[in-house]
Regions:
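Long, His/Glu/Asp-enriched segments that create or flank divalent metal/ion-associated functional microenvironments
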Residues: 1-188
Length: 188
């Protein structure tokens, strides 16, 4: 039980709230639900890497924007460390997912990777090991999607310097939840 509370501490709960709610999944899905798709396929299907990528991007965005700085500089620094830990975890999860499905990773190596290199609590790592065995490439969507969304936002910021941050993010979220490569075309 203490492993659970070490993992889900105050800073993790703030980061998780950003990821799952605002401005993460809840905001992204609200925009997606308002989108009027031109085809039934666009209305039904969505990109997992875009959805998870947006949520991971939102974690970084909030820290960069000063979330928790109003509480104290220590709270803001602790949240930054948590956000970086989660970003490291997304990279390690991607490595683990690929290596497991390429038959190049056993349980003991996966646990060592997650616990020793990724600072995951053992209880969390056991759950992740089960998850990687039941899904294929889903754990990669967080990091791959984050990189795609981050790069898209950076390119839009460069190409449309007159846009406010809100205009930029509304444009990214306003086309539903397509794969980022298609979103680039839609925003061109």
């Amino acid at each position: 039980m203490s492993s659970f509370y070490r993992e889900y501490n105050t800073h993790m709960l703030h980061n998780l709230t950003v990821h799952e709610a605002m401005p993460g999944h809840a905001l992204q899905l609200a925009h997606s639900n308002r989108y009027q798709a031109s085809t039934p396929v666009r209305a039904v299907w969505w990109s997992g890497s875009f959805v998870e990528g947006w949520a991971v991007y939102a974690e970084e965005l909030m820290v960069d924007s000063g979330y928790r700085r109003d509480v104290s500089s220590e709270a803001a620094s602790a949240l930054r460390m948590q956000q970086l830990k989660m970003q490291l975890r997304s990279v390690i999860n991607s490595i683990m997912d690929i290596r497991f499905h390429a038959h190049d990773l056993d349980e003991s190596a996966a646990m060592a990777l997650m616990v020793e290199r990724g600072f995951q609590e053992p209880g969390e790592a056991i759950g992740k090991w089960r998850r990687v065995q039941l899904t294929a490439t889903q754990l990669c969507t967080y990091y791959v999607g984050y990189c795609e969304v981050r790069d898209l936002v950076g390119d839009l910021r460069r190409d449309r310097p007159q846009w406010t941050q809100r205009e930029l993010h509304d444009a990214v979220l306003g086309a539903g939840s397509p794969p980022t490569r298609h979103l680039r075309t839609l925003l061109a």
